[in-house]
């Protein structure tokens, strides 16, 4: 059974976990803020299943996962760098759907070129909106133009947050 590792299991990570469980993967996660996550799958006929997941260590997620997906807030340092790539399973894949600058892209290229990492999918990258040419042209890296927040729900939350910030500044309410 393939193992699907999540780094970050908040609201978005839990939605991604549903996909992994739904396709029959063994889902593990590491989250600095959540020790457990309850993943509920609702089916078209009204049935539902619930899965309780316990947080694993960061190193376990790296070393045991066939696929790693990242869903964490912005950071001022790399979360995936030389040492983390060394710990990852041979031939694994990595997806960054959180923030640019989370993965050291030079190390990512080295690890893809060596075969240690088989593929990457990146929605956010360093130097947005222009990825490095090595990232852009690598046949084992799929890029999307930071569209992860392009859902209706995300746009609604952004609108409310902006309105709250404007209100705080202008003191209307």
Where is each model-derived feature located?
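C-terminal helix-to-coil terminal segments
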Residues: 48, 119, 124-173
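Glycine-rich NAD(P)-binding loop of Rossmann-like domains
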Residues: 1-15
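Residues at the starts of beta-strands that form the adenosine-phosphate
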Residues: 3, 22-26
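Gly/Ala-rich phosphate-binding loop of Rossmann-like dinucleotide-binding domains
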Residues: 17, 21, 112-113
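Rossmann-like adenosine-cofactor binding region
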Residues: 34-133
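Conserved acidic E/D residue at the C-terminus of a beta-strand in Rossmann-like folds
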Residues: 31
């Amino acid at each position: 059974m393939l193992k699907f590792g999540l780094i970050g299991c908040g609201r978005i990570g839990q939605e991604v976990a549903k996909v992994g469980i739904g396709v029959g993967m063994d889902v593990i996660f590491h989250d600095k803020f959540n020790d457990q996550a309850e993943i509920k799958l609702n089916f078209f006929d009204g049935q539902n299943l619930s899965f309780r997941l316990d947080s694993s260590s960061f190193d376990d997620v790296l070393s045991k996962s066939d696929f790693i997906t990242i869903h964490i807030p912005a950071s001022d340092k790399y979360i995936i760098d030389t040492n983390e790539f060394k710990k990852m399973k041979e031939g694994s894949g990595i997806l960054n759907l959180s923030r640019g600058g989370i993965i050291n892209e030079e190390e990512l290229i080295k690890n893809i070129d060596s075969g240690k990492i088989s593929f990457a999918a990146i929605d956010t990258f360093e130097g947005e909106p222009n990825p490095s040419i090595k990232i852009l042209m690598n046949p084992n890296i799929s890029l999307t133009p930071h569209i992860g927040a392009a859902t209706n729900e995300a746009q609604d939350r952004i609108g409310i947050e902006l309105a709250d910030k404007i209100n705080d500044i202008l003191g209307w309410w």
